Regions:
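Membrane-proximal, glycine/serine-rich, low-complexity loop/turn segments characteristic
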Residues: 20, 26, 58-62, 71, ...
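Short, acidic Ser/Thr/Gly-rich low-complexity loop/linker segments typical of extracellular
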Residues: 46-60
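A short, solvent-exposed loop/turn motif at the edges and junctions
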Residues: 41-48, 73-86
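Short, ordered, surface-exposed loop/turn motifs in non-cytosolic proteins
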Residues: 30-44
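Hydrophobic h-region of N-terminal signal peptides that target proteins for export
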Residues: 10-18
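Exposed aromatic-hydrophobic patches
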Residues: 60-65, 96-98
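Conserved catalytic residues of ABC-type ATPase nucleotide-binding domains
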Residues: 100-107
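Extracellular/periplasm-exposed beta-strand and loop segments of Gram-negative cell-envelope proteins
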Residues: 319-334, 363-373, 379-398, 420-460, ...
Length: 679
């Protein structure tokens, strides 16, 4: 039985072997050189490929197949030789091809690149892979990229972290106003969007100080480099006007809508991006409710300039917002004009100039109704309707010099900001009491005018040097701000036929300076100790005068003339342990804080000195690209501000007249905070 089975199997094998065809040979050119080719075989008259093979290094191929066809078609093809075919009998044989060089014409070639590529700490998004129909500027495409968030104000985050730098071709042209780039650079001009994790912008610190910051860099297509691009847009329309005008429109007619005709929008954007020079100049304007000033928002500053905030607690009461989308309720006449220019004399030096001007006229209308229960049978009803017009004129100029080399860092930034803004508000206030003893308090017409100009100038210098393996950092910033503001209020009682006028003048000065040095010592590869001395000074000059208000007899002062100054000298100590994925830092600063007050009206001069200790602890653990833990704790103490040292009355608005004098010898405000973040 076993012998019969073996005999049968051998018979089937012989039949199969006899049915298999083997065709082999070589593919060569006229000179006998071997050619790379793709060789296939199919039954004659059909396109059904039975088997295929590539030639080896010697140009040899071998095809083994089985078919019942009498003849077969053998084809040899390649990009350099085109396609060559031979029809032969279906039998084992040798078949050689002698071919001539002949380019193959391809109908279509599709190359699919990766949407996201990673190279170390750099993540590159291919713009073409994320661009959708209707995406005009690069900001539209950013919203589709995973991990990147774009807020309503134009701010950008990556995996929950706010970006600290925004570059176009590795150059920071816009100095934090990157809304100008995201809203105006054409998406079709950008090749890739690079996310730079653990970004250290100071070259000399890249191998010394780890950073957890994130930056974005736009890589442009070659066609967009070194060429001047100008984009223009003009639009117009009409809407029904509401007959609105301050002082002329009857305020009792609260049904008429604010509006004007005709509508218009216009923009002209010029851009130039080259290896050593960049420029972006644009004008935008409209009265269609589009807030173009958002593009001028500065999301970060290249240097830590002093904060200038001249004291002014006065302001006009404005109509309340409707809660509807701003686009539907913003009655504006907005214009922005900005010029941003950057020169790069060499690879380490930059000279930049940024100028931004914003002009607007914003009109608002609002009304409010109040209903208070005075007793079980008595209610106090009040209603107020307001119309307002705000005029804004803001000019910002910033010039900077920056040298960022592997052996040293120097930066100097000069800023000038000036605002000449004003508010005009016209309101109608009505109130009455219901119940057993009803009373009509009549209608009061309230006119407010708040003139609020401001000027500020500051300069900031920063240099960093390496001393062996250690680092020395020096930073100095100083500035001056002046704010002469006037609030005028007129109240007309329509029932009693009387009028009252109030005028509040506030003339405020602020002089600020900040100086600090630090010396960082690196111990091994993980530990970094930093020691430094810092000094700050803030001088506030406040002169106010109130007219038209009758104060209580016990506090009859209606003016202020004083200087409130603070000085601080601190010894800073920071201890850090850091790896690429883990960081923990302890700060133990010790501050000597002095306050002085010179009140010329009260003839009061005194000062206080405090020794303050503000420890802090922070830690960060990057578990993966998308998951990290962040925790921190700090202790701080509040020691006062200019808002608590004036003894004369100031009109905050026409409803509030206040004075504030608090002894600050023993400050009692304290704060402890703990932060925890998990993403």
């Amino acid at each position: 039985m076993h012998r019969l089975i073996i005999t049968a199997m051998l018979a089937f094998a012989a039949i199969a072997a006899s049915a298999q065809t083997v065709i082999e040979g070589t593919v060569a050119d006229a000179q006998g050189k071997h050619v790379e080719a793709y060789v296939s075989v199919a039954p004659k008259g059909t396109g059904n490929i039975l088997v295929f093979a590539d030639t080896d290094a010697k140009g040899h191929y071998r095809l083994e197949f089985t078919t019942e066809a009498d003849s077969v078609t053998v084809s040899a093809s390649g990009l350099a030789i085109g396609s060559h075919t031979k029809q032969v009998a279906n039998r084992s044989q040798r078949l050689d091809f002698c071919v001539k060089e002949q380019a193959m014409q391809l109908k279509e070639v599709t190359v699919r690149a990766q949407k996201i590529r990673q190279n170390g700490d750099t993540l590159s998004y291919l713009v073409g892979a994320y661009q959708q129909q209707g995406d005009r500027v690069i900001g539209d495409v950013l919203k589709h990229m995973p991990g990147i968030e774009v807020a309503d104000n134009g701010g950008i985050k990556y995996n929950g972290k706010t970006i600290k730098k925004f570059y176009v071709e590795e150059m920071d042209l816009l100095q934090g106003r990157y809304g100008l780039a995201t809203n105006n650079i054409n998406a079709s001009d950008v090749a890739t969007v690079q996310v730079l994790e653990h970004h250290q912008p100071v070259k000399m610190l890249q191998d010394k100080e780890l950073s957890d910051d994130v930056a974005i860099n736009l890589k442009l297509k070659n066609s967009a480099k070194g060429t001047v691009a100008i984009n223009t847009m003009l639009g117009g329309g009409a809407q029904q006007a509401g007959g609105w005008h301050i002082g002329k429109r009857p305020l009792t007619d609260s049904q008429a809508a604010i509006g004007q005709s005709p509508l218009w929008t216009a923009e002209v954007v010029g851009m130039y991006f080259a290896k050593r020079r960049q420029n972006m100049t644009l004008y935008k304007g409209n009265n269609t409710g589009d807030d173009v000033s958002k593009e001028l928002t500065q999301h970060y500053s290249s240097v830590n300039s002093v904060s200038l905030y001249p004291f002014c607690p006065t302001g006009a009461l404005m109509p309340n917002g409707s809660g509807l989308p701003q686009k539907r309720t913003f009655d504006n006449h907005s214009q922005i004009l900005t010029m941003n220019h950057l020169e790069k004399p060499n690879k380490d030096t930059e000279l930049g100039l940024n100028i931004a001007y914003y002009n607007d006229r914003i009109r608002r209308e609002g009304s409010s109704v109040g209903d208070q229960f005075v007793s079980n049978d008595s209610r106090l009803l009040a209603s107020e309707a307001m119309t307002s017009e705000t005029k804004l004129n803001n000019l910002n100029i910033q010039g900077r010099y920056n040298r960022n080399a592997p052996n040293g860092f120097v930066a100097n930034v000069l800023k000038v900001d000036t605002h000449w803004n004003s508010d005009r508000v016209d309101g109608l206030l009505a109130s009455e009491r219901t119940g057993a003893n009803p009373a009509n308090y009549g209608n009061n017409r309230v006119r407010q005018h708040f003139d609020r100009p401001q000027l500020s100038v500051s300069n900031t210098f920063n240099t960093i040097r390496n001393i062996g393996k250690n680092t020395f950092d020096l930073h100095f910033s100083a500035g001056y701000a002046h704010r002469p503001n006037t609030l005028t209020v007129g109240v007309d009682s329509l029932l009693q036929g009387t009028s009252t006028a109030y005028t509040q003048d506030v003339n405020s000065h602020h002089i600020a300076a900040s100086f600090n040095t630090s010396y960082a010592i690196r111990v091994g590869q993980r530990f970094r100790f930093s020691y430094g001395v810092s000094a700050t000074a803030n001088l506030h000059g406040i002169v106010t005068d109130l007219d038209g208000f009758t104060p209580p007899a016990e506090h009859a002062q209606l003016s202020n003339d004083l200087w409130y100054n603070t000085y601080c000298v601190a010894l800073a100590q920071t201890y850090k342990y850091e790896t690429p994925n883990f960081y923990i830092g302890l700060g133990v600063p010790l501050e000597l804080y002095t306050q002085t007050l010179d009140d010329k009206i009260r003839n009061d001069q005194h000062g206080y000195t405090h020794l303050l200790f503000f420890p802090s602890l922070s830690a960060n653990w990057s578990i993966s690209r998308d998951l990290w833990l962040n925790a921190g704790a700090n202790y701080s103490k509040t020691v006062g501000d200019p808002g608590g040292i004036y003894s004369g009355y100031i009109m905050s608005n026409y409803r509030a007249f206040q004075r504030s004098y608090v002894e600050q010898l023993r400050p009692r405000n304290a704060m402890v905070s703990v932060r925890f973040k998990l993403l």
